[in-house]
């Protein structure tokens, strides 16, 4: 290849900024939004989307960003993947909706078959589909309660499971999610989650769980323990191996259903199709959503057949659950994972990002911790490493500086003092390097 072509390829940037951020058209639309959209739907990033392709997003002002927000983890296959667009178009031309329990359709059955082939269950398993991650969690608890005949549920500090009543009760962050919205669901109990950086060991957390079964709730009344294998909104905190094994053992000892919430961790985000595969531990039920359908509203509960069959006839469901257009997208997503090797790609992305983040940790005292699994990685900012006092203002300022430079970054953590990576797994090496360079420039601007 000619040297001038190689040089041009090397200097081509995915990011293209034409205006200040936000630009005039974005500001105008946001002003209209303020007049007609409910105030609680506040905006994290004040840029208005016009189109997306792969790992990039272009706003209405013509600015193109590299997208590390990824629809909050919904876009493992990227924006507008051609295979997904084709599948959605084809299904939409046939029919949009019937309600599967009224007039069933094959795509629901096919998606169940394909997901269960991938899911980490050794015996007979079944699936049920819903619209959003929060619905999947609520229905997983329904399955567990029906199977065990018990009412209580145990969750963990730092968890996020959704924003409807039961899932919000399980969620462990008051602001902005819970403050002023109670009362919450009864029979929900919470114990610490391991966090090595915050000096909560797996042994500590397991001891707290055992103590809760003595002091808070009798084990014979507990239907389920609901756990994220990597806490998402809590700050991308992976569960230690011995903790996951310990939870499984306690569930087995007391006949409790172990629910793995894989809404954010699933579909290759951690370098395995599902994060529970890292631990070699089989859950009883698993919730999935987000990247399952490339951003279309679809979620599911996958689990052991005996548990999934426990509720009575029509005890779970809903008018729109398992929409055929979203399920067609999901089948295309699974094809893309297989054809483009996105599980392995997530591992490569994770290794690349972790290497850069580790360098930042050495360079910037405010980068207190680097953690995650696969491509699901975050940095935690602190005021100083001695006290580890959370520094949420740094996470906010870095995200703002990055957006102005063309990188969309999200925050995370119960103190909102983390920046996290949820980039499309189809991101190219050049785009990844460019994005990490912008992140580093933003750190320099904020921390210098």
Residue spans of the language-model regions?
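Conserved N-terminal phosphate-binding loop of PLP-dependent enzymes in the Aspartate aminotransferase
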Residues: 2-448
């Amino acid at each position: 290849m000619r040297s001038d072509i190689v040089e041009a390829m090397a200097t081509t940037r995915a990011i293209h900024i034409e205006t200040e951020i936000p630009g005039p058209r974005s500001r105008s639309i946001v002003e209209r939004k303020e007049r007609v959209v409910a105030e609680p739907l506040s905006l994290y990033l004040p840029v208005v989307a016009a189109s997306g392709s792969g790992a990039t997003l272009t706003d209405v002002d013509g600015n193109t960003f590299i997208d590390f927000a990824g629809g909050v983890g919904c876009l493992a296959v990227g924006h507008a993947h051609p295979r997904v667009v084709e599948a959605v178009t084809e299904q939409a031309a046939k029919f949009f909706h019937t309600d599967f329990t009224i007039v069933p359709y094959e795509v629901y059955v096919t998606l169940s078959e394909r997901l269960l082939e991938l899911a980490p269950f050794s015996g007979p398993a079944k699936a049920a589909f819903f619209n959003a991650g929060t619905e999947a969690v609520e229905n997983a608890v329904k399955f567990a309660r029906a199977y065990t005949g018990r009412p209580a549920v145990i969750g963990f500090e730092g968890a996020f499971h959704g924003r409807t009543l039961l899932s919000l009760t399980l969620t462990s962050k008051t602001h902005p999610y819970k403050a002023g919205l109670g009362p919450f669901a009864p029979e929900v109990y919470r114990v610490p989650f391991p966090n090595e950086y915050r000096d909560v060991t797996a042994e500590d957390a397991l001891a707290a769980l055992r103590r809760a079964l003595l002091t808070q709730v009798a084990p014979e009344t507990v239907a389920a323990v609901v756990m994220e294998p990597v806490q998402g909104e809590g700050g991308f905190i992976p569960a230690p191996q011995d903790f996951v094994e310990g939870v499984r053992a306690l569930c087995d000892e007391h006949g409790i259903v172990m629910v793995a919430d894989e809404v954010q961790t699933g579909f290759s985000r951690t370098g395995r199709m599902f994060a529970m595969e890292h631990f070699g531990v089989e859950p009883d039920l698993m919730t999935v959503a987000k990247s399952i359908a490339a951003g279309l509203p679809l979620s599911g509960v996958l689990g052991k057949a005996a548990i999934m069959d426990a509720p009575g006839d029509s005890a779970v469901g809903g008018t729109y659950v398992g929409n055929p257009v979203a399920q067609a997208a999901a089948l295309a997503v699974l094809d893309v994972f297989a054809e483009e090797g996105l599980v392995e790609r997530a591992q490569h992305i994770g290794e690349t990002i972790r290497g850069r983040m580790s360098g930042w940790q050495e360079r910037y005292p405010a980068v207190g911790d680097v953690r995650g699994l696969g491509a699901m990685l975050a940095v935690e900012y602190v005021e100083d490493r001695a006290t580890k006092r959370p520094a949420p203002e740094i996470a906010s300022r870095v995200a703002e500086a990055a957006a102005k430079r063309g990188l969309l970054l999200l925050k995370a953590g119960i103190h909102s003092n983390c920046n996290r990576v949820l980039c499309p797994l189809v991101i190219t090496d050049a785009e990844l390097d460019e994005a990490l360079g912008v992140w580093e420039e933003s750190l320099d601007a904020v921390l210098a």
